[in-house]
A protein has these predicted regions:
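Membrane-helix exit/interface motif
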Residues: 29, 62-68, 97-100
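Short, charged/polar, low-complexity loop and linker segments
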Residues: 1-4, 65-73, 108
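Conserved catalytic or regulatory cores that recognize and/or transform ribose-phosphate-containing ligands
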Residues: 103, 159
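Short secondary-structure subsegments characteristic of cysteine-rich extracellular domains
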Residues: 105-124
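Amphipathic alpha-helical interface elements
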Residues: 1-61, 77, 83-84, 132-155
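Amphipathic alpha-helical coiled-coil segments
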Residues: 123-134
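Histidine-centered, metal-coordinating catalytic motifs and their short helical/loop contexts
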Residues: 78-102
Length: 159
């Protein structure tokens, strides 16, 4: 039987996972935009800063739309998964407690709420793992050995 503290802890853990997903997805969009605009060869810190600001001020749904504009996928499986993540995130942050209403007042109700949070957490966790893997793959592909050597030798990688 879940206590209120356990319920709130699970909500917090799920919220953290949602934010990790959002951050990783934003990183993928920014890295893709950098690649598409050749910022890795011809740096444009002002354009990159503007792009980051737009990403950070956007809803997750808008960031997902940006991703579809910047990066092409062979199939829709990843986009479909990210859309499920968007739905899970919105269920969490837009009315989770309202939807469950008085369930918080009983042990059985709180168990129900925790079970719902576990499902949302699992969906968001899977989305975060995919987005984080994409971000890592883009970074490995785009950051050259020469740029790494310049950075580690004390030279600025930005001209």
């Amino acid at each position: 039987m879940a206590s209120r503290d356990q319920l709130y802890a699970k909500f917090g853990i799920t919220a953290e996972t949602a934010q990790l997903f959002e951050t990783a997805l934003g990183t993928v969009v920014l890295a893709s935009k950098g690649h598409n605009n050749n910022w890795y060869s011809e740096q444009d810190p002002n354009a990159a800063a503007r792009a980051l600001e737009v990403i950070e001020c956007s809803t997750l749904g808008r960031v997902l739309e940006m991703l579809k504009q910047e990066l092409r996928f062979e199939d829709d499986l990843i986009i479909k998964q990210f859309k499920r993540g968007l739905v899970a995130r919105n269920k969490l942050f837009h009315g989770f407690f309202e939807r469950h209403n008085y369930k918080i007042q009983s042990e059985v109700g709180r168990d129900d709420m925790v079970a719902d949070l576990e499902e949302l957490h699992e969906e968001l966790f899977q989305c975060w793992r995919v987005a984080d893997s994409l971000a890592s793959a883009l970074a490995e592909e785009l950051i050259t050995e020469e740029q790494i050597k310049k950075h580690t030798s004390g030279e600025s990688p930005i001209k």
